Amino acid sequence: LRRLDQLVQQNGGPIDIVGWSLGGIMARLLALHHPDRVRQAISLGSPIRVEDPEANLSESVRRLSQLAGLQRGRRGHDLTEIPVPSTVIYSRQDGVVAPASCLQPVGPTAENIEVRGAHIGLGHNPAAVWAVADRLAQRDGEWAPFEPPSAMAWCYPDPDRAPEPVPRPAGT
C-alpha cells in the first residue's frame, strides 16, 4: 500500500491500474478496498470470479494442476463488482483461464471487451493494447464504453456472443 500511496501522491490523485492474469485480480482488489486511490481498473485474462478454483482453468491446465497438487486448499473469490470504472479484456481462446470466469456484469462504468488470442499473449495483443490505451486516455469523470475504430472492428468479436458469466451461488 505504500507504493500505491506514493503513486497517488506523484499523480496528484487516483491512478489507473492495469493487470494481467493475477495482476488483474490485484488491480481489482486494490480498487475494491481503496477506491479513493484508484481511478479505474483494467484486467486482462483475469479470473475475477471463481466459485471453484478448478472450474476457471482450461482442461489442460486443470489436469497439470491436479498432477502437481496445486489446487488443494484454494478458495473461490468474487471481484466482479468494484466501486470504480472497470474494463475486463478476455479471450475465448485464452487456453489458461475459462473466459466466463473473467466476465463482470456490464453497467454504466463496467464493460467486457473480447479479443482474439491466447492468455500468454494478451499483453502484446494489438487489439488488447489498443483497448487499454483507449481506456487510459479517457478524462476523469468522462468514462464511456469502448468503441473500436471502424477499421479495427474486426479485431473485437461480437459482444452479444459473449459467454455467460459464472453464476453466483444461491443466497449471494
Where are the regions that the model predicts?
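Short alpha-helix in the alpha/beta-hydrolase fold that links the catalytic acid
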Residues: 98-105
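Alpha/beta-hydrolase-fold serine-hydrolase catalytic core, especially in secreted/extracellular enzymes
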Residues: 141-172
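Serine-dependent carboxylesterase/thioesterase catalytic core
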Residues: 1-85, 170-172
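Acidic catalytic loop of the alpha/beta-hydrolase fold
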Residues: 92-97, 120
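Conserved beta-strand scaffold positions in the cores of enzyme catalytic domains, especially
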Residues: 41, 86-88, 112-114
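Short beta-strand/loop motif that positions the catalytic acidic residue
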Residues: 82, 88-90, 94
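Post-His helix in hydrolase/transferase enzymes
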Residues: 123-136
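Histidine-bearing beta->alpha loop at or near hydrolase active sites
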Residues: 116-122
